[in-house]
């Protein structure tokens, strides 16, 4: 079984926001956001940063990763 990479669905619930709301804010198809929420696909890191900003959380709060490579990329994105 594939491990969940992101926590977008969990954070949306915590913030009382919907997939549809997030899709509208990002100008994305709701089906795309749904795939992110079920971890069947992942947003790119730039989009993930936008999601974090919209939800008022740190980008790391959206990830379930102990993978140093992913964490390193997140640090680079945050600093740019």
Regions found by a protein language model. Name each.
Residues 19, 30, 45-48:
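Helix-turn-helix DNA-binding elements, focusing on the entry/boundary residues of the two helices
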Residues 10, 63-80:
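Short, charged recognition helix plus adjacent turn
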Residues 37, 55, 63-66:
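DNA major-groove recognition helix of helix-turn-helix
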Residues 22-23:
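Short alpha-helical "recognition helix" segments of helix-turn-helix
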Residues 27-43:
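Recognition helix of helix-turn-helix/homeodomain-like DNA-binding domains
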Residues 1-18:
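A short, Lys/Arg-rich alpha-helix, primarily the initiator
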Residues 46-61:
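DNA major-groove recognition helix of helix-turn-helix/homeodomain DNA-binding modules
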């Amino acid at each position: 079984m594939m491990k969940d990479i992101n926590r977008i669905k969990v954070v949306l619930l915590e913030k009382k926001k919907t997939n549809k709301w997030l899709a509208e804010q990002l100008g994305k198809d709701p089906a795309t956001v749904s795939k992110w929420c079920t971890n069947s696909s992942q947003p790119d890191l730039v989009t993930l940063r936008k999601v974090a900003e919209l939800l008022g959380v740190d980008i790391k709060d959206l990830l379930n990763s102990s993978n140093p490579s992913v964490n390193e990329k997140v640090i680079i994105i945050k600093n740019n």
